[in-house]
Amino acid sequence: MKRQGFQFKQFFIEHQDCAMKVGTDSIMLGSWVTGGDLINASETQRFLDIGTGSGLLAIMLAQKSSEQTHISGIDIDKDAIGQATRNMANSPWSHRLDAQQASVQSFTQNCDNPKFALIISNPPYFNSPILTHEKQAQKRVAARQTSELTHHTLLNNVVRLLAPSGVFYCVLPSDVSQAFIELADPLGLSLIKQLTVFSKPDTNALRELLAFRFNDPSCIRDTISRALTSPEPPTRDTLTIYTQSHQYSDQYKALCKDYYLNF
């Protein structure tokens, strides 16, 4: 029987048991993150994928990170974790990957060494309830509704899990991203990088790829100066996925070339 999934350059992702299939959001986020300096670190470090689903983001990180990096994926859905575990086992980096069925709250409470150099998430973003009785549809709704994981809960756990010099990456719809940024700031997470994504030229913004880091008070001695000092403004860029003729743009190809089979 033919496998249901998506073939990347160095690995295959099966996703038939997952509520959320392989999609552009995660591919963009994983590609964007793996261009960062943390990926090439030579020291032992740990990464975490919150809401791992099929394990795609965790495996994308494994492809580009050093042998000293271990990546864990967590998800509340049993079927998704089963799928992620199989995808990880079939990847070339199985020895550096693991998947656990857990909510981020329980994972944080039970984690023996809760400091990750990099945390990544493609989190839920719908607020309003959607009623459905079909099992797979229910799971898809849960994966995309904040009733299962509110943004406030996500951020509160990220600040407990993230190493002092670590970076948190996520992708959100453009119309909810500013509220998310404003939630992160009082928790000590400052936006350091933002990529605004457009589907085609002359369209409204579609997605925001965001990177956060803890405010760094190390160079400021007194509390008053620290409170009055603003962090460096974030680096901002834009990306357009398609040309007007609905072909992948050169910019999008350049971003995802290490993963897409035909780029």
From Swiss-Prot:
Q: Which GO terms describe its cellular component?
A: cytoplasm
Q: Which GO BP terms sit in this record?
A: methylation; tRNA processing
Please indicate if the UniProt record lists S-adenosyl-L-methionine as a keyword. yes
Q: What is its EC number?
A: 2.1.1.223
GO function term, MF aspect, one: nucleic acid binding
Family stated for the protein in its record: Belongs to the methyltransferase superfamily. tRNA (adenine-N(6)-)-methyltransferase family.
Stated name of the protein: tRNA1(Val) (adenine(37)-N6)-methyltransferase
